[in-house]
Amino acid sequence: MAERDHYHTIDDPNVPCNFYDTVNLTGHRLFPNGSYDYYGTIVPAELVGTYDYIHSSLTERIEVREHVRGCVCKFKSCLNICCPWRQVFNSEVDGCIIDHTDNRTWPDPPMLNITFRNESTILVNMFTQFAIQSFRPCPKMFSLQPETSSWDDYLLFENGSMLRVDDKLLIRKNEFCMVPTYVNESDMFYTIHPANCDMQDDHSTVKIINSYAMMFSIPFMMLTIAVYLLIPELRNQHGKSLVCYLIGLTVGYSSLCYVQLYQVDATGVTCKVFGYTAYFFFMGAYMWLSVISFDLWHNFRGTRGINRFQEKKRFLFYSLYSWGIALVFLAFTYCAQQLSNLPDNLKPGIGDGVYCWLDMSNWAAMIYFYGPILAIVVANTIMFIMTAIKIHGVQREMARIIASENSTKNLRTEKDKFGLFLRLFLIMGITWLTELISYFVGSDKGWSKLFYISDLANAMQGFLIFMLFVMKKKVKHLITNRCSSVRDGSNQRQSQYSTKTTSSSVANLSLHEKPSVEKPLVISSSVDPQKTTIFR
């Protein structure tokens, strides 16, 4: 449902920031106030923490001896190099080494063309423009070499991200690294270029696929919304609640797809607008799911306290509840992101310059998204169970006594509604469950097949909802009747127009002719000249 990072490792809650925003401060100068000097950049004490692990790649977290790291990327743009400077990756040892047999010259200083926000491109010193990190995102990587192929053209931005020009894919700083390259064996100088993950490990590509999976659901949701708005018989309490629920999902999915597919700048206002829009409508959708659960449960209660309200007033109450609570969550999330004294691992991460959606690499997503949804799903489950128990009790009671035909019909109708929305709840429950599990085990390759199940659930849920709520025999019958009534109404209007035109012609004819008492008006028939029609 969300812009998930299938291949992420979650940081500990007690560290000051995401591992990918840190550098190792071991051996660097420590000041009495707790700050560190990292190659001329002062890292303040509040952005220094102790880590007992490292991320050896985007998918692996390794426990190591405690060491000090600083969140230098929080106040200076970082750029990632695959190996420490003047070292190269050796596949035999699966690590970085100093190759003493290599006589090529390293650039000193390394100069890079950087594109800035004003779209100007400037040649800058890599070491002065960026804080340098050393991290290899994936086991298998390939370097871009624009000297040999225009397909490898790229743009480096001032925030450390990169745009692959060929497929317009914006890649975050922790998903690629800079590497020394050469074109020919005879070349005596290294050139610094980015290296991408191999296609099977290309996390940005995986997220693009997930976006298309979500897009597959959107048309079916829109069709379902249209049917329930156009058919008067479906515009009851449950139908309107379903429409609001689907509107929330549709807008949420559309916002995330736009951000992902159009490579929205993570530092711009557009990123924040779409990120918070998606958050608000997703939360609103789940609140409407709880409304549906409550309304079903309420209809089977012995008392009917809320039934004193008319249906319009009840729908207004439900609307204020669902969208109002979603608005409260939105305000809470936005304020948390703006608090300067709140640790970064507790901030939602929406529009923070890296993400347009929630930061899935720490526990913030649990606080602002998965936690509230978990509470809603648990409450819905309880209400569905209570409703099922009540239905069973009513059935037994009606079997014991002689029930009227109306009572039996009403019970059957409510049971049908319950069964229908129970299936909806199961569809959403499975989707939500796979999302939650993928969040917790995102760095474990053994669970990688679950991600495909989650993508499939995202792709299929709109289609399943359409089949469940539109392709029912009763709804198809209503659609047929609606189309027939529209067609009949059009024919009737055409007939009325023709009749009115004929009457008008006859009236005009009567006005222009002088009536004669002795001599009636005779119109000869065009079919048979012997026959005549007389109008008096």
Curated annotation (Swiss-Prot):
GO molecular-function terms, A-Z: G protein-coupled peptide receptor activity
GO biological process, alphabetically ordered: cell surface receptor signaling pathway
Region: Disordered, residue numbers: 487-506
Glycosylated position list: 24, 33, 103, 113, 118, 159, 184
Cell compartments where the protein resides: Cell membrane
Cytoplasmic side: 233-241, 295-314, 387-417, 471-536
Extracellular side: 263-273, 336-365, 439-449
GO cellular component, one term: plasma membrane
Protein topology in the membrane: Multi-pass membrane protein
Low complexity biased stretches: 492-505
SS bond partners: 17-71, 73-78, 82-177, 83-96, 138-197
Pfam families attached to this UniProt entry: 7tm_2, Methuselah_N
InterPro entries, A to Z: GPCR_2-like_7TM, GPCR_2_secretin-like, Methusela_ecto_dom_1, Methuselah_N_dom, Methuselah_N_sf, Mth_GPCR
TM ranges: 212-232, 242-262, 274-294, 315-335, 366-386, 418-438, 450-470
Family according to the record: Belongs to the G-protein coupled receptor 2 family. Mth subfamily.
UniProt-listed PANTHER family: G-PROTEIN COUPLED RECEPTOR MTH-RELATED
Self-association and partners: Homodimer.
Function: Involved in biological aging and stress response. Essential for adult survival.
Name the UniProt record assigns to this protein: G-protein coupled receptor Mth2
Species, as recorded: Drosophila simulans (Fruit fly)
